[in-house]
From Swiss-Prot:
InterPro entries: Met_Sox_Rdtase_MsrA_dom, Met_Sox_Rdtase_MsrA_sf
Source species taxonomy: Bacteria, Bacillati, Bacillota, Bacilli, Lactobacillales
E.C. number(s) listed in UniProt: 1.8.4.11
Protein name (record): Peptide methionine sulfoxide reductase MsrA
Organism: Streptococcus pyogenes serotype M1
Cystine connections: none
Keyword Oxidoreductase applies: yes
Entry's Gene Ontology molecular function annotations: L-methionine:thioredoxin-disulfide S-oxidoreductase activity; peptide-methionine (S)-S-oxide reductase activity
Length: 169
């Protein structure tokens, strides 16, 4: 099994697209990239810990390749917005691909270069590619949020879905 970590704005919106793929064993919401061990949601939202909201994906590389996860990641984000994603603003919502191996880094960098060269976006691709740091699980009420709170999830992801429809369909 392998591990992938992606930050793409609110972690609530990043779970379902990955969870629906064959070969995915788990998708968990959490925090990474900061300087405070085991931060709380409130601390991360206060923008004082340096963490981003992210998802940790455990996957079977025999069933789904890391490259495919990176390609799916792009289609869930606005890779031209370094200061958050959609209605969620700030460093804790910035788009990041965290790599856990040098091979993941190479795949992510090549994929980013391909996306930039594709001309899909007029603006530069600003999603960063960074080494994975400790991943801290978010509180239980954040796990599987889209299943537990479908109406609130739909409301919180409306702007994201409009952008994805307009730019990735």
């Amino acid at each position: 099994m392998e591990r992938a970590i992606f930050a793409g704005g609110c972690f609530w919106c990043m779970v379902q697209p990955f969870e629906e793929q064959a070969g995915i064993l788990s998708v968990r919401s959490g925090y990474t990239g900061g300087h405070l061990p085991n931060p709380s949601y409130e601390q991360v939202c206060a923008k004082t810990t340096g963490h981003t909201e992210a998802v940790e994906i455990i996957f079977d590389p025999k069933q789904i390749a890391y490259k495919d996860l990176v390609e799916l990641y792009w289609t869930q984000t606005d890779p031209t917005d370094a200061f958050g994603q959609f209605e969620d603003r700030g460093d804790n919502y910035r788009p990041v691909i965290y790599y856990t191996t040098e091979r993941q880094k190479e795949i992510a960098e090549q994929s980013k270069a391909n996306l930039q060269a594709s001309g899909r976006f007029d603006q530069p691709i600003v999603t960063t590619i960074e080494p994975a740091e400790p991943f801290y699980l978010a509180e239980d009420y954040h796990q599987g949020f889209y299943k537990k709170n479908p109406k609130r999830y739909a409301q919180s992801s409306a702007i994201r879905h409009q952008f994805l429809e307009e730019n990735w369909s």
